A protein has these predicted regions:
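PRPP-associated nucleotide enzymes
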Residues: 1-264
């Protein structure tokens, strides 16, 4: 979904599925395009919008808000696969936005590849959760999240963290082993899991099982980006988690009473 200064655009189509681009009369040369990725169609709509603004307005200042960056998981060269993030970022760079705002990218490769890129600070979302909930420990579900968030997040003085370690089959992507590292006594304690992305939720289900085995009480999850595919996985049905906090960067199905929109 794309909006220009909060005005939806490209959301209607002709019978053959070509987009209809209804425009409004803008009395400004300052624009914020909000890009919420749902399908690759949104990329073509984005291109049309930026080309239009550049064509009609004299040197417009156009800021792109792209909380979730498509293809950010494909952030390296892997034999037999296209380095798709690289080419997507090249496409965005070619559009020459004044600024590109992103949220909690999968790795720093994304922010390195994007020109004039600034990151939205997730500290505000974590602080909001601590204001609402009684949290005893923070848990990072893997080494990557531990290394990343332990550097950039400021936790309350009385809160410490521990983390998980997972081993995947690189061919199938399936997690074949999961363990808790440096786990304190969490009997009857409330745990907040923090990570960037949830697809089917397999990692968080494994983490929830391990935390419950150690006696954890409430388990909450914060992810910056949550895909609708969470409903196709076992995480919600498992009832291991008590609440899931996420932004509106991807998710459009808020039907589960476990999922809460944060930062809205």
């Amino acid at each position: 979904m794309i909006t220009i200064n909060d005005y939806p655009i490209g959301n209607e189509c002709y019978p053959n599925n070509e987009r209809i681009y209804k425009i409004k009369n803008y009395d400004t040369d300052y624009f914020v395009i909000d890009f919420k990725y749902e399908t690759d169609l949104d990329i073509s709509i984005l291109i049309m919008c930026k080309k239009y603004l550049d064509d009609v307005f004299n040197n417009p200042k156009v800021i792109l808000v792209m909380k979730y960056v498509p293809y950010s998981r494909m952030d390296r060269n892997i034999e037999g696969y296209m380095f798709s993030l690289k080419y997507f970022c090249q496409l965005i760079n070619d559009l020459k936005f004044h600024k590109v705002l992103v949220l909690d990218t999968h790795s720093n490769v994304t922010t390195t590849l994007l020109d004039r890129c600034e990151e939205i600070d997730i500290q505000q979302y974590i602080d909001e959760i601590f204001d609402k909930e009684k949290i005893d420990y923070v848990f990072y579900p893997d080494n990557g999240s531990m290394e990343r968030y332990s550097e950039i997040l400021k936790l309350p003085n009385d809160i410490t963290y521990f983390y998980g370690n997972k081993k995947r089959d690189l061919q199938t992507g399936k997690i074949i082993n999961y363990e808790l590292v440096d786990c304190p006594d969490i009997q009857n304690k409330n745990i907040l899991i923090i990570d960037d992305l949830c697809a089917f939720g397999g990692t968080f289900k494994l983490a929830g099982e391990k935390l419950k085995e150690k006696g954890a009480n409430d388990i909450l999850l914060y992810v910056s980006h949550c895909e609708n595919s969470i409903y196709k996985g076992e995480l919600i049905k498992s009832k291991l988690l008590d609440k899931i906090y996420t932004t509106d960067s991807i998710l459009s199905d808020w039907s589960s009473n476990l999922i809460y929109n944060i930062g809205d």
